[in-house]
Amino acid sequence: MNKNLSDFLQKPANVVAPLLLGCILEREINGKTIRVRIVETEAYDETDAASHSYKGKTPRTEIMFGDPGYLYVYFTYGMHYCCNVVTGKKGTGAAVLIRAVEPIEGEQYMQDIRPVSGVQLSNGPAKLCQALEIDKRLNGHDLSDGPLRLVLQDPVDSDLITQTKRVGISQAKDVLWRFYLTGNEYVSKV
């Protein structure tokens, strides 16, 4: 694990979530590079009834309780994968869901994988996982190394970030732990 990345991600999930906006995910697939900008995130931790880690460590959530900077991938609705960046100190059960990304390099290759165009390509957590071929094989992956890397960027000005309620959850609905780049067309739901 890259020390700078680990140090950056050791903060609580609700602190890291807005800081990930504007950061880059680089995905290597079959010798091709795809680069996307993170435009929407949601924070979760073990104190949060909406979090997978709320009821403690299980085989499914073990990654969330590990070191920061690893990928937590889960299968949902019997058909889709979603990916999260583990945050906080080891043992805290915290992660940030990547809800939407904007292609900046390799968009055509993403469309070859997920044959849709425009914002529908990656404006949701399952859509971006399909377009980047993120599945259970990457669960526990170190995000400082290939084939999927998180590249930190300078923080986005807070005036350009919207903070609101999270999407598609049945518990802790009023917690304002969803963050997105205001006005970005790739945001899943406004």
Where does each model-flagged region fall?
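Conserved, well-structured core segments that form or line functional sites
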Residues: M1-V190
